[in-house]
Amino acid sequence: MKTITLNIKGIHCGCCVKSLTQVLTELDGVQSADVQLEGKANITFDENRVNVAQLIEVIEDAGFDATE
């Protein structure tokens, strides 16, 4: 397992946090996602099942901007 912190733009409220947490944790290979209102997400994932580019893509598909 690997843990990464991503910077996320576009998180404005608790609903954004909940929505993004749900999208990430539903992704195959993600063990946990701690999304913070301050624009950070700590994600623990299995590198053999998902990669950072896929995490960023899912976040962007949900309407947010993400960078490492």
Swiss-Prot record:
InterPro entries per the UniProt record, alphabetical: Heavy-metal-associated_CS, HMA_dom, HMA_dom_sf
Keywords, alphabetical: Metal-binding
GO molecular function: metal ion binding
Binding site for a metal cation: C13, C16
CDD domains: HMA
Domain of life per record: Bacteria
Pfam families: HMA
Keyword RNA-binding assigned: no
Residues covered by the HMA domain: 2-67
Record keyword Transferase present: no
Protein name, as recorded: Uncharacterized protein HI_0292
Organism: Haemophilus influenzae (strain ATCC 51907 / DSM 11121 / KW20 / Rd)
